[in-house]
């Protein structure tokens, strides 16, 4: 990866961290120079954040990287956050992971736990 690509990736990580910070999440950068030793961003427990800030993205390759890294790091559901110039941020997930999150949100009880224990998240912490 060239230095300009690394700079753009680091800028994308900082940009996304700032946006998530505006939603109230305390996000830390792992550093784009870590070469996969730590996640790109941390601060959403249960979600492995992979950030791509490129004009041409091979979504399947990037998602496979996110899946591999999330399995290796055991830090949560793989989610690919990506955007192109002058375009909004998008999030790509496997359907099964999206359904898991959706079931947890829909099945949440007053105690804050999902009825089917699919994933113990609190929707107010993840979705605003």
Residue ranges and their predicted role:
Residues 1-128:
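Catalytic phosphate/metal-binding cores of nucleic-acid and nucleotide-processing enzymes, i.e., regions
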């Amino acid at each position: 990866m060239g230095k300009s690509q690394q700079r753009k990736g680091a800028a994308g990580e900082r940009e996304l961290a700032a946006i998530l910070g505006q939603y109230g999440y305390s996000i830390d950068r792992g550093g784009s120079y870590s070469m996969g030793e730590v996640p790109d961003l941390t601060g959403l427990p249960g979600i492995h954040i992979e950030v791509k800030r490129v004009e041409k993205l091979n979504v399947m390759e990037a998602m496979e990287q996110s899946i591999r890294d999330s399995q290796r790091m055991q830090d949560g559901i793989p989610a690919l956050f990506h955007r192109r110039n002058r375009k909004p941020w998008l999030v790509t997930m496997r359907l099964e992971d999206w359904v898991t999150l959706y079931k947890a949100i829909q099945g949440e009880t007053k105690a804050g736990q999902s009825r089917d224990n699919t994933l113990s998240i609190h929707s107010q912490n993840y979705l605003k």
